[in-house]
UniProtKB/Swiss-Prot annotation:
Record's function text: Catalyzes the ATP-dependent phosphorylation of N-acetyl-L-glutamate.
Catalyzed chemical reaction(s): N-acetyl-L-glutamate + ATP = N-acetyl-L-glutamyl 5-phosphate + ADP
Enzyme class per UniProt: transferase
Gene that specifies this protein: argB
Source species: Listeria welshimeri serovar 6b (strain ATCC 35897 / DSM 20650 / CCUG 15529 / CIP 8149 / NCTC 11857 / SLCC 5334 / V8)
UniProt-recorded name of the protein: Acetylglutamate kinase
Length: 250
């Protein structure tokens, strides 16, 4: 399927969807673009865990997830964040549906090799049939970043990773990773473009750290696996940082 745009909503973006955002979505739909959203919810998961007095721990930008933390993650993503997003679309008369790994095993996953992270997984397969059927009906799909393994256990998946896997599986023409910052910064300057070969150097030099590490690694994967363009930004209007997979010639 052509003309697919995947958008990852992260940080507190689900509570700050602007009229400009919805206007852009409407413009894209008018141009026969098909829209898929993958949402995070880390901020709200942390707030809920703190309220329940569950320790919050991370490693290399990923949340360490035991069974208790996983249950909170599922509750917040499927029961709080996703309905907030879908309701905002419905309020504006835009057809939308929320999906998660429980829907026809949408996102198959396996645990990461780093067992210190607990019940954290990586996507091994995106079952695109359901998504494509909905997109053919001009219905926006909103996907929670949770996976199910081959023994039907749920796994927490980094939302950037999930978005990049979905975009790659759909061969999207564009992937927007929306976050709380306007792009990748080197001190106070936004880096306009990053080659995938530069990411390790930027990490070693401390330019990128924390949650930006898995974000850039995921973006690099998407850029190398069939996604037309990958952009890290804080809004659909801003240029942000483009991730490219080949060295420019000339």
């Amino acid at each position: 399927m052509e003309n697919i745009i995947v958008i990852k909503l992260g940080g507190t973006a689900s509570d700050n969807l602007t009229e400009n955002f919805f206007q852009k979505i409407t413009e894209w739909q008018g141009a026969e673009k098909k829209i898929v959203l993958v949402h995070g919810g880390g901020h709200y998961i942390t707030k809920m865990m703190e309220a329940l007095q569950i320790p919050v721990e991370t490693k290399n930008g990923l949340r360490i997830t035991n069974q208790q933390a996983l249950e909170v993650t599922k509750m917040v993503l499927i029961g709080q964040v996703q309905p907030t997003i879908t309701s905002a679309f419905q309020k504006r008369g835009i057809s939308v549906i929320g999906l998660n790994a429980g829907d026809t095993g949408l996102l198959e996953a396996e645990r990461l090799n780093d067992r210190d992270l607990g019940l954290v997984g990586k996507i091994t397969k995106v079952k695109t049939n359901l998504i494509e059927q909905l997109l053919a009906g001009n219905i926006i799909t909103v996907i929670a970043p949770l996976g199910i393994d081959n023994t039907y256990n749920w796994l927490n998946v980094n939302a950037d990773t999930a978005a990049c896997e979905v975009a790659s599986a759909l061969k999207a023409e564009a992937l927007y990773l929306l976050t709380d910052v306007p792009g990748v910064k080197n001190e106070s300057e936004i880096i306009s473009e990053i080659n995938t070969t530069e990411i390790n150097k930027l990490q070693t030099s401390g330019v990128i750290k924390g949650g930006m590490i898995p974000k850039l690694e995921s973006a690099a994967f998407a850029a190398k696996h069939g996604v037309g363009q990958v952009i890290i930004t804080d809004s659909l209007e801003n240029a942000g940082t483009k991730i490219r997979s080949k060295v420019a010639i000339g």
